[in-house]
Amino acid sequence: SHGSSKQALETVQRLLPGLCNDHGLTPAQVVAVASNKGGKQALETVRQLLPRLCHDHGLTPERVVAIASHDGGKQALETMQRLLPELCNDHGLMPDQVMTIAGNKGGKQALETVRRLLPQLCHDHGLTTDQVVAIACNGGKQALEAVQRLLRLLCKDYGLTQNQVVAIASNSGGKQALEAVQRLLPLLCKDHGLTRNQVVAIASNSGGNQALKTVKELLPELCKEHGLTSNQVVAIASNNGGKQALRAVQRLLPILRKEHDLTPEQVVAIASNSGGRQALETVQRLLPGLCNDHGLTPGQVVTIASNNGGKQALETVQRLLPVLCADYGLSQEQVVAIASNSGGRQVLETLQRLLPVLCKDHGLTLDQVVAIASNGGGRQALERVFAQLSRPDPAL
């Protein structure tokens, strides 16, 4: 589904057998490389450079595929091959750090900018190599150049610390976020009563620029007309997608209060996570059915929604609650407890898949499986327990 899709498809047809048989890639890896702008060139570059990158530079085929699976994958691979020795030998980076920088969109430009600016950022501005790498891996070329330009000003004139500037820059859109902080921090502090730390917290996420501008625009209305506090507005804005979450609160808070009897505190709790907008919209849509048809309380629905991935968790509860209760013997409270963590959807789906095997084949009780699932990282914990019981590791 790209302008160069014809060339990519023809190249997959031509190179897939060789990449799989001679180079050990899977068909899925070949497709991943091809499914970006410039997929044809990326596949040809993988075929050309994979042996050398693995043999001479110690990369794994998986790392080569990860670097190639972006727009501009060809350029990223060629630049990494060219700069890896210099960045490691002359600039003190680890091979993994170079690979990580290359494995993001704009990897070529980010690597070239690290080579150019790392000495100055470390020697003249006091940043560490790890900080430069963090900026390059997220904000890329533009963020590194913005840090070079604005670091002294933001620290000297605005009172920020170097760590705060790095935190703002180390996100997608870091350049724009730094410029927004330079422009809006005095206004947000003087006119709206925010602290520097609050402004930094809002800016230190993907989309920080938009979130800061939206806070400036909506803070008076959200506080005066909707009864929120400044701290609540900041909490909503201080996540990926903060702009969208604030606008969703502005739009849905009156409806959720009037039609669904939610409190402002509950609405804020739902909105104050990555994906807050989607979670609020899903609560509005699914709360009546979850309460009337599935017997949940509004408080339980809010608890499920008030995590990263709340939208997906609510939709999965709607789909799996009847099955998990009727066929697997879980109580509603147990399903809610499992769903009420970040990644609730994945945990519920993994529980549905592994619960019968863990109980019947490995002798765990229902309560033991539920206890494993009812924490952050529940999906990974269930899969690790299953793997260990299926093929015991003597070291454990």
Each language-model region and where it sits:
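Accessible peptide chain termini
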Residues: 1-3, 396
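Leucine-rich solenoid repeat scaffolds
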Residues: 373-378, 382-395
